[in-house]
């Protein structure tokens, strides 16, 4: 719990749902595409596949037949995969990608009919919100690798990630208004990623924007040709994974903590973080390595 303890000492508050023992280990088949969830329930199949190597965890939305819809089962699988050994020093970066031509079509509308009932609907949206908040509060950077269409909650997922790399064939939309369900929860992430008027046009019309438009408005970080997507995403991930985990974790937490503050408060928080950073073993190691003209040897 060292990372969490350190961030708490810095003043980062983890949401209540993250305090409900989210760090419990998953089943032994974590890296198997067909493994069960944390409870091993047959009724909640895992719809994601994962692999981890050299500090980089790849989480793949693996239900292309359903356009990688963020059903409740998919959301629970994604949440488990993100939380799995989140404090392990071996984990440096997470990449979220998808099988098939659609990154994610958003919520499964078949789960949102009257037949499921209000309580079920509330669980779907609460679980989705938990996943998005988890991405924000996770100690390691989380990247989206997008190749295709990302709509509604799928667009929300992209907007929630720390970095997003997309192929030039990708597009993004919040089309819920067209089926009578305004994308209110996707609007939370979208409205914090793009200018207000851009977000509202997307929300009011449901019309898609291209990858280049998404880049121009700040929804994504980079656009590359489809054949270069994986290589470019991995290049970024490998660079991050080569750095100090504790320094990056502190930096990520500080960035999001200061962002909504007024300028004076933001600088106060950031100044505190710089002092805390210098107190880290890796903070001193990096400075000493620079002075001695050698590569730093990070503690993790």
Swiss-Prot record:
<protein>
    <recommendedName>
        <fullName>Enoyl-CoA hydratase domain-containing protein 3, mitochondrial</fullName>
    </recommendedName>
</protein>
<comment type="function">
    <text>May play a role in fatty acid biosynthesis and insulin sensitivity.</text>
</comment>
<keyword id="KW-0496">Mitochondrion</keyword>
<dbReference type="InterPro" id="IPR052377">
    <property type="entry name" value="Mitochondrial_ECH-domain"/>
</dbReference>
<dbReference type="GO" id="GO:0005739">
    <property type="term" value="C:mitochondrion"/>
</dbReference>
<keyword id="KW-0276">Fatty acid metabolism</keyword>
<dbReference type="GO" id="GO:0006631">
    <property type="term" value="P:fatty acid metabolic process"/>
</dbReference>
<keyword id="KW-0443">Lipid metabolism</keyword>
<feature type="region of interest" description="Disordered">
    <location>
        <begin position="34"/>
        <end position="53"/>
    </location>
</feature>
<dbReference type="Pfam" id="PF00378">
    <property type="entry name" value="ECH_1"/>
</dbReference>
<dbReference type="GO" id="GO:1900078">
    <property type="term" value="P:positive regulation of cellular response to insulin stimulus"/>
</dbReference>
<dbReference type="GO" id="GO:0004300">
    <property type="term" value="F:enoyl-CoA hydratase activity"/>
</dbReference>
<comment type="similarity">
    <text>Belongs to the enoyl-CoA hydratase/isomerase family.</text>
</comment>
<dbReference type="InterPro" id="IPR014748">
    <property type="entry name" value="Enoyl-CoA_hydra_C"/>
</dbReference>
<dbReference type="InterPro" id="IPR001753">
    <property type="entry name" value="Enoyl-CoA_hydra/iso"/>
</dbReference>
<dbReference type="InterPro" id="IPR029045">
    <property type="entry name" value="ClpP/crotonase-like_dom_sf"/>
</dbReference>
<feature type="modified residue" description="N6-succinyllysine">
    <location>
        <position position="110"/>
    </location>
</feature>
<feature type="transit peptide" description="Mitochondrion">
    <location>
        <begin position="1"/>
        <end position="66"/>
    </location>
</feature>
<keyword id="KW-0809">Transit peptide</keyword>
